[in-house]
Amino acid sequence: ANKQLRQGRTCYKHLAGRLGVGLTARFRARGLVDRNWRLTRNGEELLTTWGVLPGESSTENLVTPCMDSTERRFHLAGPLGTAICRIFFSRGWLERLGATRAVRLTPAGGAILRDAGLDPGEYGSAL
C-alpha cells in the first residue's frame, strides 16, 4: 500500500491506517473505550470537550470496531468514529493529503492528543 495511505487515511467516514489504529489503541489503553467497545464516562467527558459526541443521549452503539486492511488491527468506526473524523477535519486537527484518502495530523491535532494524554507518537507522524 502507498506509504501515505498506510500512515493515515479515511475508511468510509472514519480514520484508518496507523493513525486510526494507534488512536484506537490509545483510547482503549486510557479506558476511554472499554473492552466491549463501549464509550466510558471518561471517554464521554473527553469527547464532549472536543465537541465530538453525536447528539444521541445514549452512548450505546456509538462505537463499532472496524478491521484495518493494512494494519490488521481494529480502528474506531460507527457514529463515534465518524464524529471524531468530522470534528478533527473541521477544527484543522487533521488534513487531507491531496485528492486521496490519505490524511495526517496537523501540529494542532498532535497537541490536542498530547494534552489529552493520547500522545500520537509514531502513529501520528507525518511522512
Question: Could you describe each region identified by the protein language model?
Answer:
Residues 1-127:
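Long, charged, low-complexity, helical-prone intrinsically disordered regions
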